[in-house]
């Protein structure tokens, strides 16, 4: 944490510690769940059957309507946490992606994620996955290959990039409803609107 708070004093330092503390707590909880579910470590089959993988940009708010399920993101600990701790922590995975033939001008964020999938380093957990095309076309490029590496049914949610335009609202809502139906079909759980609104 010190690297991210260098030079801070007083209120600014306290706020940074509070914010980073929340991130650390969240990541530790997520890693604990991943380790429990991973067949190579904890092999908790019951937990695994209740996990829905979301990519790092997928709106986790959606899972408020599935109180009996757990959402996890395998990209967050593998790519984002490691690069927060060490800026060159994911360079190897970016190189793997380039060696695969992806141009080097693709954003390093989705390139690193794709590299983890290509190197077969993601834990194989969950009963299904939902991915979205944000934040950029680089994410869209890697999602299909990542989905194959997860070896579970995966839904690709296509978010309109110009999401504030009136002309895309109906389509965007339809995509979210399709994702909900996909999760229902894969898990046997029904979306609970009361739980959803309570969680917001």
Question: For each of these PLM feature ranges, what is it?
Answer:
Residues 1-200:
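An N-terminal assembly and electron-transfer interface module characteristic of large anaerobic redox
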């Amino acid at each position: 944490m010190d690297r991210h708070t260098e030079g801070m004093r007083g209120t600014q330092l306290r706020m940074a510690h509070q914010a980073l503390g929340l991130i650390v707590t969240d990541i530790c909880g997520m890693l604990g769940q991943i380790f429990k579910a991973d067949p190579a470590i904890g092999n908790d089959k019951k937990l695994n059957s209740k996990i829905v993988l979301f990519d790092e940009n997928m709106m986790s708010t959606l899972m408020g309507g599935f109180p009996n399920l757990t959402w996890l993101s395998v990209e967050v600990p593998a790519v984002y946490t490691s690069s927060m701790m060490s800026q060159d922590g994911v360079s190897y995975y970016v190189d793997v992606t380039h060696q695969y033939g992806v141009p080097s001008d693709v954003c390093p964020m989705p390139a690193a994620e794709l590299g983890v999938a290509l190197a077969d380093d993601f834990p194989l957990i969950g009963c299904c996955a939902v991915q979205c095309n944000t934040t950029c076309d680089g994410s869209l490029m890697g999602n299909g290959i990542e989905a194959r590496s997860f070896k579970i049914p995966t839904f690709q949610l296509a978010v309109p990039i110009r999401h504030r335009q009136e002309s895309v609202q109906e389509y965007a809502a339809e995509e979210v409803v399709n994702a909900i139906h996909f999760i229902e079909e894969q898990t046997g759980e029904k979306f609970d609107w009361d739980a959803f609104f309570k969680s917001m």
